A protein has these predicted regions:
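A hydrophobic alpha-helical transmembrane-helix feature that marks the membrane cores
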Residues: 2-267
Length: 267
């Protein structure tokens, strides 16, 4: 058998790779748990999105459409860059962190970050909250990336390319059929909650989650389109631009993780 991180030959009795130190035991458990936990970020942000629609905004805080959408793009790319740098420089060292500690740290920081983004009217505080979500999520992504061979592996490269193509495709779909995405909110939320509960049960039972990965990938693809559409319905302020970037980031990051699992299982 081969190490999922460095692809070197290892013995079935090895608990850690002799070459890179990657954890070999419990190979499926940690990624399955990470998928279910990271999906909860979208649930946590649901009420915040609803509040932003109804929010009364000081007219002086409104910025132009170009500045608003430009801020969303810059903040989103910042999050993706942070994730890339974590994958690049943390690498296999991520396996020295207990997966449970990693997940608990993500949940705690993500809750704090999402609350900061939702409650603060200061764009700087909102951006700090954004980073409190992006950095621990980036460490989770690093774990998943190294689990499937690192940045240079075929699985990771293909997952990134497919994620990029789907994100661009969903953006185009929003421009073509915005009314379709305007009706998806309640249905997407219900399916997501059901999916998380289903995955938790399957994880406890030790069932390999291939079908749910495909369902989740489709769900997060639709979420990308939905959150891009919703971003244009909020009052156009710097604070809402950061919050919208967080929504879209979570969609894209979760889609990437699911595609990693799909392509990894395929191999």
């Amino acid at each position: 058998m081969k190490c999922p991180s460095c692809q070197s030959e290892v013995s079935a009795a090895d608990k850690h790779c002799p070459n890179c130190g990657a954890q070999l035991g419990g190979e499926n458990g940690a990624p399955e748990a990470m998928k279910a936990v990271t999906s909860t970020g979208l649930v946590l942000g649901k009420k915040a999105r609803e509040a932003r629609i109804k929010e009364v905004v000081d007219p002086s805080a409104i910025i132009s459409d170009r500045a608003y959408n430009g801020t969303i793009a810059i903040v989103l790319l910042w999050g993706i860059l942070i994730n890339y740098l974590l994958c690049r420089f943390v690498g296999t060292a991520i396996f020295t962190i207990n997966p449970i500690v990693l997940l608990v740290g993500y949940v705690v920081l993500a809750i704090v970050g999402i609350v900061m983004v939702a409650k603060s009217q200061n764009p700087g505080i909102s951006f700090l909250g954004y980073n409190l979500v992006v950095i621990p999520f980036g460490l989770v992504i690093t774990y998943m990336v190294e689990h499937y061979g690192g940045i240079g592996s075929e699985v990771v490269t293909n997952a990134f390319l497919y994620t990029l193509l789907i994100a661009v495709g969903m953006m185009a779909c929003v421009m073509i059929a915005p009314n379709f995405f305007s009706k998806l909110g309640g249905a997407l939320g219900a399916v997501l909650i059901g999916l998380i509960l289903c995955e938790v049960v399957l994880m406890i039972l030790g069932v390999r989650q291939i079908v749910t990965d495909w369902i989740a990938a489709g769900l997060f693809a639709l979420y990308i389109g939905y959150d891009i559409y919703r971003s244009q319905q909020f009052p156009k302020t710097l604070k809402n631009a950061v919050a919208s970037a967080l929504d879209i980031y979570l969609d894209i990051a979760n889609l990437f993780i699911r595609l990693l699992e799909i392509l990894g299982h395929k191999d």
